[in-house]
Amino acid sequence: MRNFIKNHTGIVCILVFVFVFILCSFLFRAVIDKMIDEDRYHSYTRYEIYTEMNQLTYDSLKSVLVEQVNSYIQQSAPTSALDGLVVVNNCMDYDIDICFVLAQGEIESHFGTKGLARKTNSVFNVYAYDGKELHEINKNGKYKHPDDSVEPYIELLKREYLVENKTEYDMLKKYVNYCGKRYASAPDYEQKLSSKIEKIQQTTDIENTYQMLKKQGYILGID
């Protein structure tokens, strides 16, 4: 054996080198794979933490906003049964300015506590809508609960008023639908609505909280 090694020293060195090289390659690959796996793990963990923190922020902001809306409704109309959560959810779902909605709900029926709304529960004095034709569900415009009247009102805005890139604040100049029909007959309706919105923005943090909630929703991919 010793003679073989002496006679074939070059070959033995090459074989040893190849063996060591292969061994080191495997070890190096194992270390690299472990580092990659750990990096993926930590990156995934950081992403999860980031998402969870954003979700907690979103939920907290939403709770604050609902409380602010309920507080405003109760201060303006203590006997109102309108739930702020319903208002917030619909404004977020349809991307409607929440101060505009609150202002109109207060002007139209004092949040369901005055006028015909006491019998119809139609906070915005809008008839029911089934997605196809106005007045199809309920020709009398009656709802079981004031909360049920919020979405039909917002759908009406989206379908007939907020068209051709018009915004809620365009309605403060001339509140008409695509046919030119006014939402209300009062000639100073736009001024009343504008003043009410300004009051809400100046006396509450509803607008600021709503905008923060929308931004947080964009971060989380919530439409």
Predicted segment positions?
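Catalytic cores of secreted/periplasmic lytic hydrolases that degrade extracellular macromolecules
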Residues: 2-102, 106-223
